[in-house]
Amino acid sequence: MADPARARRLAKRITTIVASAIEYEIKDPGLVGVTITDAKVTADLHDATVYYTVMGPTLDDEPDYAAAAAALERAKGVLRTKVGAGTGVRFTPTLTFTRDVTSDTVHRMDELLARARAADADLARVRVGAKPAGEADPYRDRGSADEPSDAGGLVIRTSDGLEAENTGDDYQAED
């Protein structure tokens, strides 16, 4: 088993080699618009999974994922040879190409966030014209407004209908 740091370094080197080979050396029309995003290498350094994305001819066109996958399968042997020559490891890892769905997930999350923002905006528009259902202060007794007494406290009506004076002394020390 190799050191995890060594596996990460090898994966980064494989990403660079494969991306450079696709961009400058392999002339396959199916690889136009293919971008290598990441690579993962197993702990024994024998297998590498290379992640890729595909861009369409224009921003509005859907990319041809099947053609890109077929082109990568055709170029797999050449790419593995270039990885073996460029890495200098004893055993050249086998390459497996997997479409990177991170950008699709990001796009989906952006759509969900936009939908949530629109729902929040609708709720804010409804909230502007809304009135409370009932009194603004439902706990205030309208019949007996709290008035100051002669002693400076507030007169409070209890549940029995009796009046009591609130002197503000909620805490009284015991002797």
From Swiss-Prot:
GO biological process: maturation of SSU-rRNA
Any one of the GO CC terms: cytosol
Region of interest called Disordered, as start-end residue ranges on this chain: 129-175
Acidic residues composition-biased segments: 162-175
Keyword Phosphoprotein listed: no
Domain of life: Bacteria
Alphabetical UniProt keywords: Cytoplasm, Ribosome biogenesis
GO MF annotation list: ribosomal small subunit binding
Pfam families: RBFA
Keyword presence, Nucleotide-binding: no
Disulfide bonds: none
PROSITE patterns cross-referenced by the UniProt entry: RBFA
Locations listed in the record: Cytoplasm
Family, similarity comment: Belongs to the RbfA family.
Subunit: Monomer. Binds 30S ribosomal subunits, but not 50S ribosomal subunits or 70S ribosomes.
Function: One of several proteins that assist in the late maturation steps of the functional core of the 30S ribosomal subunit. Associates with free 30S ribosomal subunits (but not with 30S subunits that are part of 70S ribosomes or polysomes). Required for efficient processing of 16S rRNA. May interact with the 5'-terminal helix region of 16S rRNA.
PANTHER family: RIBOSOME-BINDING FACTOR A, CHLOROPLASTIC-RELATED
Annotated HAMAP family: RbfA
Name by which UniProt lists this protein: Ribosome-binding factor A
Originating species: Mycobacterium marinum (strain ATCC BAA-535 / M)
